[in-house]
Amino acid sequence: MPQNEYIELHRKRYGYRLDYHEKKRKKEGREAHERSKKAKKMIGLKAKLYHKQRHAEKIQMKKTIKMHEKRNTKQKDDEKTPQGAVPAYLLDREGQSRAKVLSNMIKQKRKEKAGKWEVPLPKVRAQGETEVLKVIRTGKRKKKAWKRMVTKVCFVGDGFTRKPPKYERFIRPMGLRFKKAHVTHPELKATFCLPILGVKKNPSSPLYTTLGVITKGTVIEVNVSELGLVTQGGKVIWGKYAQVTNNPENDGCINAVLLV
């Protein structure tokens, strides 16, 4: 046995101290507090490097937790479905000609490119920057004013990772992040609570679109897979656009009309 491993040798012969495991548990419990105290006291380049390292660790930890959660959730097994099986709502579409389907698809794509959507609200009031973005003063003497906090409802995707708070320019509060919208189908005259996939266009500013700000008149993309809508080719439609018709920041919910 190497000369420097005398502690391991002693433990093999006589076992651990009686209070060893208790002491270890308490030390691990204190570690988080000690690390945070260290982070608060550090200044300069050392602090920057330390915060960067801690930020990377936190991201890794969150990703690991998410993976564990995914592992525990039950997922539908697609392999059990027979290969030739067709859902009931597609049975009458078997004899449709391929050429007709293709021409309709091309027409639809051209229509989408041209952006010929008849929206329920063609004109909406523009939202000013002072109204949407509140100035946050930072620094020891509160002299810096480059940070902005979004004061309207916004959508943030699942894969979004925050920058370290020190370098984050636009802050989107958790209380204003929405994931679902109440979407009304104009032909069916029914309302569904559907998950939001993204913000297509905010009429006020391209900046609001990139930030995912949802105000009255914003066009959002929603997941309509549970509605059972299908294309002429028999494929299930996954996402569709809808326009927001209310002021979500006042009502506490997003009401939208599906664009069909």
Swiss-Prot record:
Any one Pfam family match given in the protein's UniProt record, by short name: Ribosomal_S8e
Any one of the GO CC terms: ribonucleoprotein complex
Disulphide-bridged cysteine pairs: none
Cross-link (Glycyl lysine isopeptide (Lys-Gly) (interchain with G-Cter in SUMO2)): 80
Chain intervals for the UniProt region annotation (Disordered): 20-42
Main location: nucleus
PANTHER family: RIBOSOME BIOGENESIS PROTEIN NSA2 HOMOLOG
Membership in a protein family: Belongs to the eukaryotic ribosomal protein eS8 family. Ribosome biogenesis protein NSA2 subfamily.
Protein name: Ribosome biogenesis protein NSA2 homolog
Organism this protein belongs to: Mus musculus
Gene coding for it: Nsa2
